[in-house]
């Protein structure tokens, strides 16, 4: 059986910024941002963002699909809500998101 090794693709500065946008939006959606006081409306807006045209455009630039990002978000959300992962593990997963894109 062969082992699959995940390697980080070399990313352009633009791609790094786009990945950071997705990561920050996920942190906001999960209320992980400690440096900002987000209102519930802003948190809900972050949660809804993954199903918007803006997200689709960013995904296209990154060579992935919006559906893939939504599935990643939904999977993390389910694991976090059911206690399978804690806040620290969730934050770690979001920071390593580029490995999944």
List PLM regions with ranges:
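Charged interaction scaffolds used for protein-protein
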Residues: 1-101
């Amino acid at each position: 059986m062969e082992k699959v090794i995940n390697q980080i693709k070399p990313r352009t500065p633009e791609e790094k910024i786009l990945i950071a946008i997705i990561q920050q939006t996920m942190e906001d959606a999960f209320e992980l941002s400690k440096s900002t006081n987000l209102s519930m409306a802003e948190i809900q807006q972050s949660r809804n963002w993954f199903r918007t045209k803006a997200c689709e455009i960013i995904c296209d630039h990154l060579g992935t699909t919006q559906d893939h990002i939504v599935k990643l978000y939904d999977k993390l959300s389910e694991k976090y809500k059911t206690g399978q992962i804690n806040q620290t593990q969730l934050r770690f997963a979001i920071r390593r998101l580029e490995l999944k894109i």
